């Protein structure tokens, strides 16, 4: 995660660091856009806290999160990038009145703005960008059985992570108008595709 943050920091013009509540926020510009970076940590709680801190201190119009995910679709290759069209939880069950993965009182899925997804998918370069569903849960997918269990509920899932849906839910609750997640597919989990 430190490596990812360092790479993103190189994109900023004249970056500065602010420390708030024990967290470092890196501020700068990309062209005319003000950008704030932070490292949230692994898991739903860390990512939700990071999202709340970002919203509280900087009031973003757009929240973009990035990380490394396991590929849930056998057509994906290592280093392909999945851009969320929607996010949901793969480990939530609130009874038969809710969809599997839905938290009671929340949408079943948190949709990303279609225009941003289309822009990301249209980017040209050496890396393939694939739009699709990202599912989040509180455990590493380190076996074929775990991946099969996820795909039984979400056969259309493109990637699996531990943060994207909790950030999307936090943005939904706090009224952040736009959110989407960018995941680089990691080699370790790609090998765990359910066949």
Language-model regions: role of each:
Residues 72-154, 159:
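Mid-sequence, gly/pro-rich, charge-dense loop/helix-turn segments that line enzyme active sites
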Residues 88, 183-187:
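Short connector loops/turns at beta-strand edges and beta->alpha or beta->beta junctions
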Residues 188-195:
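His/Asp/Glu-rich mid-to-C-terminal helical/loop segments that flank catalytic regions of hydrolases
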Residues 161-177:
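Short glycine-rich, acidic/polar surface loops and turns
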Residues 1-52, 57-58:
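N-terminal short beta-loop-beta anion/metal-coordinating cradle
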